Amino acid sequence: MASPSDPAVPAEAIEPAPRRRNLSPWASWSLHLRSVVDEDPCPDAAAAVPAWRERVRTRLAAMLGSPPPAVPLDPEVTDEVDAGDHVRRRILYDVEPTMSVPAYLLVPKDRLAGPPGPAVLAVHGHGPGKEMICGLTGPAQEHYALQLVRLGYVVLTPDLRCFGERQDPQWSPEVHKYDCDWNLVAATMAGAVPLAQNLWDLQRSVDLLVAHPLVDPARIAVAGLSYGATMSLFLAATDDRIGAVIVSGYLSSWRAAHSVPWNMCGSQVLPGQLGRLEHLDVASLIAPRPILVESGTEDPLFPVDTARATVASLRRVYAALGADPGRVEHDVFEGGHRWNGARTEAFLAGPW
């Protein structure tokens, strides 16, 4: 056998050692994350922030794409339940020619006769959908729609696509854990984006609230945990009818969140956003409206240190835009990836 020093063996046939190789997609992704540089970071100079924010707005609109054709909502109340201190109504309404949304409308009993007053669009995260946040299942800590109606707000709680009643009934429970995956596949083939699809559904949900006789159109807030917080942030950033927003268990950065090996749902991302659209960028579009951020000290998905840094940067953005940085509130609590709710009442009672 020829040795490496044998002149009969071409030099290019000898593999240098050691040679680093990687077979792990996750490791490759992690290495890529470390190399990402923001193309258009928030400028340090306050005078440059307004123009930067408009560039963010343009990038976000391009990533979301064009909305589907609007159809009449044609709302229908299919059920009404006396829930003690409030009434829970099941509502169906149309958002696309081939898609409808089921939702609960929670109305405090002392609001049933009017006049129009404030409302909150409560957006669920991963889990059973609207049932849990309305207090019909799951731990009490996650019943934030129930908390909101008991604070006196009319609350609309739609099921997002692939959750709750919008899971496909012909499939087994085992298959349901892949609902977001197949929806991502279907949307990709159709040239659509699941985040944009759910954002459209929420914008149409705002249309429903605006037209409701018990709702003051100038007093609509949005609140959500985890994926619900993702959608709450994007909704407030793209719809000026939202007067205030509560973002729980989310605001930090994509780079920090994706450095943790956990199963990321494809419904929470946009094509080409890495290095071009960070949490701070989206949040900047909410100014000067008030935002309450909740962060658990033990949240394994959205690190609290990154959340603190992002909130500090967001306050600087507010100041640069001539808005009160005090309108960016941060509730850091002892705990993990969950809703806290300790400052919800005071926050929503403030000016917005």
Where are these regions (language model features)?
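Alpha/beta-hydrolase fold nucleophile elbow
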Residues: 213-226
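Cap/lid segment of the alpha/beta-hydrolase catalytic domain
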Residues: 112-116, 121-200, 207-211, 256-259
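Mobile cap/lid helix-loop segments that gate and shape the active-site cleft of serine hydrolases
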Residues: 182, 188-189, 204, 242-283, ...
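Glycine-rich nucleophile elbow surrounding the catalytic serine of serine-hydrolase chemistry
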Residues: 224-234
